[in-house]
Amino acid sequence: MDPPLKDGVIMRQHRISIFKKRRRSMKDIKILGVDIAKDVFQLCGIDEWGKVIYTRRVKRAQYVSTVASLKVGCVVMEACGGANHWYRTFMGMGIPTQLISPQHVKPYVKSNKNDRNDAQAIAEAASRASMRFVQGKTVEQQDVQALLKIRDRLVKSRTALINEIRGLLQEYGLTMARGAKRFYEELPLILASEAVGLTPRMKRVLNCLYTELLNRDEAIGDYEEELKAVAKANEDCQRVQSIPGVGYLTALSVYASVGDIHQFHRSRQLSAFIGLVPRQHSSGNKEVLLGISKRGNVMLRTLLIHGARALLRHVKNKTDKKSLWLKALIERRGMNRACVALANKNAPIIWALLTRQETYRCGA
């Protein structure tokens, strides 16, 4: 029987085993899943067999230096707030980095939800060969996306303000014609009239709201001028704008949300990315197609459909092949479905123009 080891020898062997395990962890990390937050980041590294070999919780100030000290095959984070900044940071350092959609991570979260389990789920999801990743954005793309979102918020708040003024006037028995154009024509007349039954206090309130509305219009105009200048200076936006029914807002939304067009190997993939293809609920030999999936960027899909709707208003007297197809589609399926069909037709055209670096050529 071997003599018992002394406590000092046992502690020394334990420290050696921990050191060897730590060295192995730093060398063999294939995927480093990171659950990012504002101040604290949870790291989870797995090897080529999917086994967890490294876990650590670090502060924001230590995050970059900690990842840089590890020899990792790939850093993976959820595509959430701040992810694009870290994506650009690590890619600039030469560290392969991927972003993954949170909806693809959720099925891999085991037991309770916490930062440790989330980081492990991110690493495990990223290890799947069929996993789909999110394209990281450049600084320019984020600038354009910010401008588009701010403009969209201002437009929605302007609509809400117009409806608020209409509702207030209706309580005093005053109704206005439908449409923003008629609203801007009639409101100054109402405020200037003495025979409409409004109290002086209410007139002051409505004048303040009207001033706020005009300021909102001015802000929207400033952002639109900025967006037009960006679209004019971007060659890809000019190519996309050459398509009938596609304006500068749609072209910029494509630039900001799609990113590298070469991530899509077929034109159909871009339509699916935008959410313009039917949802499928099939089983066995029975194929069931439902309405459009509505996945992806809501703003881009909305702009494509609204652009298609604007184009359909002018096909009535046209006799070219595309216009005849659209008129037949409107008669058979209605205006709304025709708008979606045209938007779904424009998405592959956008893919073709950007991949081939060409301008739209109208067919006979």
From Swiss-Prot:
Keywords: DNA recombination, DNA-binding, Transposable element, Transposition. The keyword Zinc does not apply. One of its GO terms (biological process) is DNA transposition. InterPro entries: Transp_IS110-like_N (IPR002525), Transpos_IS110 (IPR047650), Transposase_20 (IPR003346). One of its GO terms (molecular function) is DNA binding. The keyword DNA-binding applies. It comes from the Bacteria. It holds the Pfam family Transposase_20. Required for the transposition of the insertion element. Belongs to the transposase IS1111A/IS1328/IS1533 family. PANTHER family: PUTATIVE TRANSPOSASE FOR IS117-RELATED, TRANSPOSASE FOR INSERTION SEQUENCE ELEMENT IS1111A. This is Transposase for insertion sequence element IS1111A.
